[in-house]
Amino acid sequence: MTDRFTRLLGIQQPIIQAPMLGVSTPALAAAVSNAGGLGSIAITGSAAEKGRALIREVRGLTDKPFNVNLFCHRPGQADPARERAWLDYLKPLFAEFGAEPPVRLKNIYLSFLEDPTLLPMLLEERPAAVSFHFGAPPRDQVRALQAVGIRVLVCATTPEEAALVEAAGADAVVAQGIEAGGHRGVFEPERGDAAIGTLALVRLLAARGSLPVVAAGGIMDGRGIRAALELGASAVQMGTAFVLCPESSANAAYREALKGPRAARTALTVTMSGRSARGLPNRMFFDAAAPGVPPLPDYPFVYDATKALQTAALARGNHDFAAQWAGQGAALARELPAAELLRTLVEELRG
């Protein structure tokens, strides 16, 4: 299955660098791809032409395959009353930094489902792979991508979601376990999160489905890769492992947190963005989730408020509200150039 997947993507190693929005860069993606893995960029939040520019920037750094990731969430609905209540709740936190919360919240991350300019751009640019998070696009759009040679990967957190991915006609399913850093890829968060671990989910999907399975969540070294492959994965997707690479855009505070004692503990929060995500706990995890918290607005409207608070805090040199996403294996992160890290992972896998 590993050989089948690497041939499908045209890569040498069964390792995908996760498309971490806000952390992955064209330089990181290109370095991973040049070293034989599948580098990734995330273009959610970018207009189609900005996404096109990012794709071309990667292409200027590598002639190897790479992946472009988009969010495919159900579009959020504006709710002025709920948004006002949330902003009022956050007002004391803004006041600590001499700032006022925004007057209203914006939909800062359009879903692939609500931006009709993205599909034509992808069909023109033809990256080797396109991956989707939070849901699968309609089957006709998957077929359109495949018709021009693009491989389609979709994240799933349960066997039920994986069945929907298969029904959509995707080429592979990314099995995201509860250990994974960043946003949970749950399709319908209002139904709850099954919280299945990576290895259990990989085994379930490999045993029941026909698609190649990409293991994602908590995998940080070659032994972790080997364990996932032995359980039926065709490849792995690793995010936190690449955050400390010099090619990532993680800032100094994020890097120091990941290298320090805080990396020993990660937690899930919904107050950062409105959707469950795993990271290094800080005041946004706790102060914004204290007793009396009002019902949250939809994702990504919540994230707009958080980003405004982060900006106010950072202006005073405070990083206590930053999104420092990390998986449960964060303490194993290594500060290596991306190509060297990939070579090390391959050596560990084979050792």
UniProtKB/Swiss-Prot annotation:
Disruption phenotype: Deletion of this gene results in an increased sensitivity of the cells to P3N. Keywords: Detoxification, Flavoprotein, FMN, Monooxygenase, Nucleotide-binding, Oxidoreductase. Its EC number is 1.13.12.-. Binds 1 FMN per subunit. It is an enzyme of class 1 (oxidoreductase). GO terms for biological process: response to toxic substance. Gene3D superfamilies: Aldolase class I. Pfam families: NMO. Induction: Expression is repressed by NmoR. Is cotranscribed with ddlA. CDD domains: NPD_like. GO terms for molecular function: nitronate monooxygenase activity; nucleotide binding. It catalyses: 3 propionate 3-nitronate + 3 O2 + H2O = 3 3-oxopropanoate + 2 nitrate + nitrite + H2O2 + 3 H(+). FMN binds at L21, N69, Q176, G181, G218, Q237, M238, G239, T240. Its cofactor is FMN. Belongs to the nitronate monooxygenase family. NMO class I subfamily. Nitronate monooxygenase that uses molecular oxygen to catalyze the oxidative denitrification of alkyl nitronates. The toxin propionate 3-nitronate (P3N) is the best substrate (and the presumed physiological substrate), but this enzyme is also active on other primary and secondary nitronates such as propyl-1-nitronate, ethylnitronate, pentyl-1-nitronate, butyl-1-nitronate and propyl-2-nitronate. Is likely involved in the degradation of P3N, that allows P.aeruginosa PAO1 to grow on 3-nitropropionate/P3N as the sole nitrogen source. At physiological pH, 3-nitropropionate (3-NPA) exists in equilibrium with its conjugate base, propionate-3-nitronate (P3N). This is Nitronate monooxygenase. The gene is nmoA.
